[in-house]
């Protein structure tokens, strides 16, 4: 009997450990700002991608493929990962995601369901953020979603949407008001829904009825329906790492102090200032310095309040502007590691060639074909990749955090400001390549060359700082 009891204890401990690991790795974070909430009038999507293990960043410029009906897109890729990649396509549609565990335990799939396919199809075919929601919704309803749950943050040069999907075939999406900004840790953030308001909501018609059927929601006892509370897995919805990061970001954006109850957090808020790219970067770099609930962690810079963590493998700020040709107006500022120790480098959607070291395959189609199959021993097989420069720099900083991080951040700050100052001048130099009235490109080859060279030269200068 004693032996059986011991085995039960060990089994329970193992289960709790695995559960903690699963929660521990859910660290992604996103911020989405409408065009009237930003200083320059752009829609902005900021995102931290957090994953453990050996990760290798690649950034491809994938050309159109008429045979497959796919458009041109910029692809931030992590080989072997189904939930890490981000996309920015030729229509200025950007997508990234955060894991959001749901209560759903029923598996309802056709042909194995979908997961990675949601983001790839958006990147390849979406003509707008609203169209992306339609594509994703139809795919989920047809095939079934095989992850526990996830929120896809989608934006174009005019608007932003949040697409929340649950295991199986249920989903709901909400448009962010143009004058607002919203943040997403690793739980659902959509609250009240109104599917009759098709300008601002989309979703499966039975999203409320299904919750009633499962016993998750009782209208008489529970009051108003809050999707985030009803469909979120309880431990994730009330997990301190989630609500503390949420509080921290909301404070950055509004200057107000929030409590620890996620029920009270609005879907979106009006910022206390018009936001700039640098504001989004500041949030992605945050270690929770602005919240009292910051909890000590085994490593000094890392704790449950961190938005930027030791496993942040990429941070991106998509700056999407509708008054420029999309090749120039849609761009992403991105890093190769934790943003607290990196500068964000600009990539334009009109680029056609990645700087040296950012594509492990010369042909993007080979990268697509081998995304899952060729994902082992990446450093051994691709030792010259630029990815390892970022990885090695991060490890070096962590070996002497107190001694190095201050100097690194100071030099990064100066370099970042130099890039901000140079952006306007560079984009003015591109005016000769398009018609100012129609916004049509008049010299595609020279524009592409200028965009390719611009980012490549920045990296050459940046890597000298490593």
Task: Write out the residue ranges for each language-model feature.
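Bacterial N-terminal signal peptides
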Residues: 6-15
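Histidine-centered catalytic/metal-binding microenvironments
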Residues: 398-466
